[in-house]
Amino acid sequence: MPALHLLFLACLVWGMGARTAQFRKANDRSGRCQYTFTVASPNESSCPREDQAMSAIQDLQRDSSIQHADLESTKARVRSLESLLHQMTLGRVTGTQEAQEGLQGQLGALRRERDQLETQTRDLEAAYNNLLRDKSALEEEKRQLEQENEDLARRLESSSEEVTRLRRGQCPSTQYPSQDMLPGSREVSQWNLDTLAFQELKSELTEVPASQILKENPSGRPRSKEGDKGCGALVWVGEPVTLRTAETIAGKYGVWMRDPKPTHPYTQESTWRIDTVGTEIRQVFEYSQISQFEQGYPSKVHVLPRALESTGAVVYAGSLYFQGAESRTVVRYELDTETVKAEKEIPGAGYHGHFPYAWGGYTDIDLAVDESGLWVIYSTEEAKGAIVLSKLNPANLELERTWETNIRKQSVANAFVICGILYTVSSYSSAHATVNFAYDTKTGTSKTLTIPFTNRYKYSSMIDYNPLERKLFAWDNFNMVTYDIKLLEM
């Protein structure tokens, strides 16, 4: 440590202006290298005594100690300042980050609120536009109905005049009674304006379809001369009667049915329903009574061993017949024993959107029931999209006979079979659709029809015929409805 003090003193003296410093190095007696630094005093011409030198050295040591203490104090203050600065900087950064996070959170909330407002605005605009379109459509429909009403009134007035003219000119009175004339028959017989014959005559004179003015019986079905039994051609479809409305989005479309040939333990009131929105359709709701069905309280829920596809299922003779999902296989599921009794592929049948009805929904294979039994409606590549109709054996699902029609399956909304005749519906969404084609399996011929058919809820995804009740069952946009029909002998 004293050597360092001497070196410091030498440097200090040299730094104060000494310009005659000498530096020398040489080996001492032991061979070690020694460095010698010589500086001339600027004020003293001769060296002081030894005691004076020691006093000067001590003064220098005291000054050095004081300077060292000042240096250490300065270093401590610098370290304190650096620590304080670091803390201040860290606090400022932390505060800035917290402020930034808070601002970003508020900004995100504002953005979400803005997006919600924009979405609500778009929804309101879309709803408003839909209302405007519906309003325009209703106004147009109202105008058409008013025009039709006026035309009908004019035609009825014209027909009344024609009937009056016929009354006057048909049977002129005679002065002398004929021998074949019964007493009281001299006057012209009066028309009974309430009879079915007069209504049919008036409809012919006014070119109004008879189905629009025929009187109905209390059950809502027009009177037909063949009664409630026997087969005939479809000539009239009534207005839909709504029995039930589905509660959830899964009921947008589906299938509901009653067994036209019920077996124990089921009755004519037993009803089944399947909601077919989704990809894994296995639940079948069973209702023992019609009132349970209308109120929505199933007595049992079947879980099918394999998923079904679309709205083509039917119930016949105690079994549920349906198309297996993503396949051309028809499955017979016995409801009482809850077991699969038969499975059969329909040769070449399109499936899973290959040849559906016009509304889509994977309606490639559609099962149907009429007075003669079980049918399947489909199409094939060989038929080039035309409807193919096959009669099925209900026990083993073997194809008994097949007919290829000239009706394109994708051009019609749905189809059903009555008395061996295939009927198609023109539209699933138009409120005023028609039964537009008929194919007779007895003659192998088809013809066009214009029987009015009402899609009240404008999305009919299923239409089936029940030969026991002589009604059409349909599923129209969440709603399960029935239609009365009229058949005439062929």
Curated annotation (Swiss-Prot):
Keyword Membrane: yes
Sequence ranges of Basic and acidic residues compositional bias: 153-165
PTM summary: Palmitoylated. Undergoes a calcium-dependent proteolytic cleavage at Gln-212 by CAPN2 in the endoplasmic reticulum. The result is the production of two fragments, one of 35 kDa containing the C-terminal olfactomedin-like domain, and another of 20 kDa containing the N-terminal leucine zipper-like domain.
GO BP annotations listed: bone development; clustering of voltage-gated sodium channels; ERBB2-ERBB3 signaling pathway; myelination in peripheral nervous system; negative regulation of cell-matrix adhesion; negative regulation of Rho protein signal transduction; negative regulation of stress fiber assembly; neuron projection development
Subcellular location(s) per record: Secreted; Golgi apparatus; Cytoplasmic vesicle; Secreted, Extracellular space
Tissue specificity field: Expressed in ciliary body, iris, retina, trabecular network and sclera but not in lens or cornea. Also expressed strongly in skeletal muscle and weakly in heart, brain, testis, liver, kidney, thyroid and epididymis. No expression detected in embryo. Expressed in sciatic nerve.
Principal location class: secreted
Chain positions covered by the region annotation Disordered: 153-184
Consequences of knocking out this gene: Mice lacking Myoc are viable, fertile and show no significant differences in intraocular pressure or clinical signs of glaucoma. They also show a reduction in cortical bone thickness as well as trabecular volume.
Oligomeric form and interacting partners: Homodimer (via N-terminus). Interacts with OLFM3, FN1, NRCAM, GLDN and NFASC. Interacts (via N-terminus) with MYL2. Interacts with SFRP1, FRZB, FZD7, FZD10, FZD1 and WIF1; regulates Wnt signaling. Interacts with SNTA1; regulates muscle hypertrophy. Interacts with ERBB2 and ERBB3; activates ERBB2-ERBB3 signaling pathway. Interacts with SNCG; affects its secretion and its aggregation.
Function: Secreted glycoprotein regulating the activation of different signaling pathways in adjacent cells to control different processes including cell adhesion, cell-matrix adhesion, cytoskeleton organization and cell migration. Promotes substrate adhesion, spreading and formation of focal contacts. Negatively regulates cell-matrix adhesion and stress fiber assembly through Rho protein signal transduction. Modulates the organization of actin cytoskeleton by stimulating the formation of stress fibers through interactions with components of Wnt signaling pathways.
Protein name as catalogued: Myocilin
Lineage: Eukaryota, Metazoa, Chordata, Craniata, Vertebrata
